[in-house]
Structure formats: C-alpha cells, structure tokens
C-alpha cells in the first residue's frame, strides 16, 4: 500500500485499528473511547467495528482504569488505556508507579506488563488547567516505564505499533496541538527502534533538541535562523525515557552548542537531565553552556495567558542568540 497523507490523530486511529485486527488480545479502554470515539475522536469507529468487549467505555475513574489494565495484562491481554487529558492522570499515578512500573522487577522478570497508556498532553488549544499540562518528567523519573512522544503522523503510527508490541509498560504522550497536522504515513515502512532519536534537520552552528509538539517549533526556528545565515540542527528525541543520548552527543560534538526545548516547566524538566548528561559527555566540545527553553515554574495559566506561558519562536531564537554569543 502506498504512503498516505493523514493527520496525526488519524495515524494513531489507524495504528490502533491495525493492532486490534492483528491481535485478539489487544483491548482499548478509557472514558468515552467507544461510542463517542474519544474527545479528540482518536478512537472513532473502533467500537463499532470491533465491539464493546474490545473497545471499552469505562467509568470516570482513572485509578480504576489503570488498575483494571494491570489485571488484564496479568491475564495475557495487551490493554491500551486512554487518559482523556494530561491533568486527569494523577489519580492513576499510584497504580502506575507502585504496580505497573515495578511488576516486572518485583517478579524477577517473570511477569510482563504490556500496557500502553495514551495521554493527550500539552497546550496550544486554548484549554483550561488540567487540560493542557505536560507531566512527562514525572513519569520519565520512574524506572520501569518507557515514555515516548511522537511529533508527526508517521512516528505516531509506528511508535504506537511498537508500544503495543512492547512487553514493558509505555506511557505514550500525544501532542494535542499537532493532532491535525498532516504528514505521509507508509504502513509498510520498517521503523527504527522505539527509543531512537532522529536528526530531522542537519546544521552546523547549534543543535536544537525537542520532542512531541516542540519539534515543529524548532524546525520553524531553524528556518528563521537560516534567513540570518545561521545553520541549526534539529534533533527529534522521540523517546523521553530512555533518552538516546548518543544521537544528541554526536550532534553536539559537531555543532558545539545545544538548546533543549519542551513545553513542561524548565525546573527539573526533562531538559535538565539532558543538559546535565550532555555537559558530562561533551564538556570539552561545548563552546557555550547548554540552555533550556520551556514553561515557567507556575501552575498552568488560564487560556488567555497561554501564549505568554508556552515557548514560542522568539523565546527559542533568544536562547539561540545567547548561545551563539559565547
């Protein structure tokens, strides 16, 4: 089948459909995922085609949803859980941290936990608090979890396939503001490893590293910088835990500068760990300190202040200017 251009949300839908078709043990669970097709219609049509026993509408109880998924995984199923919005995941945090993430190690490797938790996250859609947060660092800190975030339709499709096939739990963060961005998806492609980062734009003067919704912004920054004669490399991290530090290191050894960009607050965000590791690995290559651009260390603001809170072209370009000034 030839490649098809589709929105990121549609790519996830098609990937879930493929998984349901190929493995009767795959189940989808969550609030309004069935009859409604999800708040963002990511699961649209799946309950109609596969039935209520495989695409399951649940009560509004995130802890119960994840706990049920853990039980199903113990019985050999591969549940895919949808948390309706990023800020709704916290009632399930206990189940995720104390049970889901630890079951494999607790059993000395005998018990597998093939559970995927889908979390639409981030801002940019004018929503209120609890609907626009970026809690990925809270999960990346937990050993036993894989944490990923696609930035485009092709990765959304294939990373979902790989997440469902994983015998370890995967937290799959979906960038809401990119749901309707379209790109080519080749259903017959051979994807790289789930954890592998990718250089999506080559450059020589500075590296921008990002994941999920900020990759597109970094590409726009690189376009703007090119108009001033600056050559920026953009690395799509794809995986937040584990991080493909080797790819980032190779880029930084070439460009000698790094700016990490994410929507989550800069304080103790994923960028802090990346900055620390790259400083340790590339100390003698760096021409400037590693800089970070992210949200502020404050509760997510009302929608009318969202644009002031989130990283934008000017804030990232300012970091680029500061780095290149050294």
Q: Where are the regions a protein language model picked out?
A:
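Thiamine diphosphate
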Residues: 1-173, 308, ...
């Amino acid at each position: 089948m030839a490649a098809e251009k589709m929105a990121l949300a549609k790519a996830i839908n098609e990937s879930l459909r493929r998984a349901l078709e190929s493995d009767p043990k795959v189940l989808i669970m969550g609030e309004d995922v069935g009859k409604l097709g999800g708040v963002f219609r990511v699961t649209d049509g799946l309950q109609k085609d596969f039935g209520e026993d495989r695409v399951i509408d649940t009560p509004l109880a995130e802890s119960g949803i994840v706990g049920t998924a853990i039980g199903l995984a113990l019985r050999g199923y591969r549940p895919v859980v949808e948390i309706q919005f990023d800020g709704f995941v916290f009632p399930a945090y206990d189940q995720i941290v104390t049970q889901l993430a630890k079951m494999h190690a607790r059993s000395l490797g005998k018990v597998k936990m093939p559970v995927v938790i889908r979390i639409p996250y981030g801002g940019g859609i004018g929503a209120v608090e609890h609907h626009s947060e970026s809690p990925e660092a809270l999960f990346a800190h937990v050993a036993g979890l894989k944490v990923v975030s696609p930035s485009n339709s092709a990765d959304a499709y294939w990373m979902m396939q790989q997440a469902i096939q994983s015998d370890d739990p995967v937290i799959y963060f979906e960038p809401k503001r990119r749901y309707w961005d379209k790109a080519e998806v080749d259903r017959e492609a051979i994807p790289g490893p789930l954890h592998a980062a990718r250089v999506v734009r080559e450059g020589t003067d500075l590296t921008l590293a990002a994941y999920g919704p900020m990759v597109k912004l970094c590409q726009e920054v690189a376009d703007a910088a090119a108009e001033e004669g600056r050559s920026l490399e953009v690395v799509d991290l794809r995986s937040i835990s584990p991080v493909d530090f080797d790819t980032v290191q190779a880029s930084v050894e070439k460009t000698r500068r790094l700016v990490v960009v994410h929507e989550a607050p800069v304080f103790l965000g994923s960028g802090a760990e990346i900055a620390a590791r790259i400083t340790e690995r590339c100390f003698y290559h760096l021409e400037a300190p590693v800089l970070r651009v992210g949200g502020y260390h404050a509760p997510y603001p009302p929608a009318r202040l969202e644009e002031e809170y989130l990283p934008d072209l000017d804030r990232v370009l300012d970091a680029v200017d500061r780095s290149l000034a050294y």
